[in-house]
């Protein structure tokens, strides 16, 4: 797991500094034409898909997956990774990506051809799945604003995980749309910081 955590620092250079992974800002060298150039005449067909990718938990694997996306200009909306099979040294990477149906199929095909990849599942189309994301929110405020933030948190079933005289830190788990909605509600109530894990997902049997 330490190996993948080390690799994850590579992602932070592109993702957690407010930059979206796309052909515009992580394209490397003279890589081939962005896949998103292919969609210019089909912008109304852009879809969002959640992919579950099973890989070896070894040095360099995550960097290779990220390199595939950046080199081809594929977009990453969210990425999470963790070991799930300790004895087999395998990890699951959950990627939320966007593109036309053609681009999505191309992404899955190219991931499937990578040597350290054992399995690629498109959870968006392979039957029902369960998706969740965890986020923590720091909200600053006093008096009525503070009380209003607490009432909003109760509506969304957010937990208070830390509090000071002038702040609350809330924890919320749910679909990304729920996280987004709670963030919008908290903005006028003193929202200062958000930290999000990204989407994790499993196929329902």
Describe each region flagged by the PLM.
Residues 11-12:
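Acidic, Ala/Val/Gly-enriched low-complexity intrinsically disordered segments
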């Amino acid at each position: 797991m330490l190996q993948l955590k080390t690799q994850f620092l590579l992602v932070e250079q592109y993702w957690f500094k407010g930059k979206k992974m796309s052909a515009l800002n992580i394209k490397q060298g003279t890589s081939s034409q962005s896949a998103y150039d292919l969609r210019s005449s089909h912008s109304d067909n852009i879809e969002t898909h959640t992919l579950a990718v099973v890989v070896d938990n070894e040095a360099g694997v995550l960097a290779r997956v990220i390199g595939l996306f950046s080199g081809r200009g594929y977009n990453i909306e969210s990425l999470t990774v963790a070991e799930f099979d300790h004895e087999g040294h395998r990890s699951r990477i959950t990627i939320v990506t966007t593109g036309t149906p053609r681009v999505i199929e191309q992404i899955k095909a190219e991931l499937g051809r990578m040597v350290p990849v054992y399995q690629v599942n498109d959870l968006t189309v392979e039957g029902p799945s369960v998706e969740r994301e965890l986020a923590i929110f720091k909200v600053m405020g006093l008096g009525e604003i503070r009380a209003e933030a607490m009432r909003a948190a109760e509506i969304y079933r957010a937990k208070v995980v830390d509090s000071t005289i002038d702040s609350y830190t809330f924890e919320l788990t749910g679909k990304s749309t729920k996280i987004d909605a709670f963030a919008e509600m908290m903005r006028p109530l003193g929202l200062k910081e958000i930290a999000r894990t990204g989407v994790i997902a499993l196929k329902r049997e």
